[in-house]
């Protein structure tokens, strides 16, 4: 049977390889944008960026500015909504700076409520979805590979299997993604793959990459241009 394939030429390419259909020429291309106002600076600047056109510094409308990095402090980033960058190396640096600005400077493990944590792996049996933000409380270091914590979603609903006393069981969370913020090891995840299969995976979410941000929305964002 014929298959109708829809694609978005403005979507970020996969981290590895090519998109399944994007290497082929489309039969039809939709070019007129209806989702946002035609005069939206977001649409205009996004189109310029995709076409490789330079975007100067300054204010483009009531909602959009391009600022120099030296003019934006970690404290301002904390008040600016979600920070989005291109590279993982940038993400690690921004997370460290924003954690310090928020007062979480002791060690690389999350300390509990107030930390911005993002889930990195689907666990349908627990109600965890890759990309969702969660809150950790009562964090306990359990050894070399993981720590445990009670976990709630953004609405405050508990996450985990119900326990015998009516409360929800603590989750065991893989340390590696947090430890990468102070001692990056490119072989860590290959080395730990077998053990971490049964662990929850999460990391600091003060700053996230554009790939991780796809499909989400925020009231305000700061896009950190790192040349990706």
Model-based region annotation:
Residues 1, 15, 226-228:
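Short, intrinsically disordered, charge-balanced linker/junction segments flanking boundaries
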Residues 1, 80, 205-208:
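A generic hydrophobic-helix recognition signal that picks specific residues
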Residues 147-228:
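C-terminal accessory regions
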Residues 3-169:
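Conserved helicase motor core of P-loop NTPases
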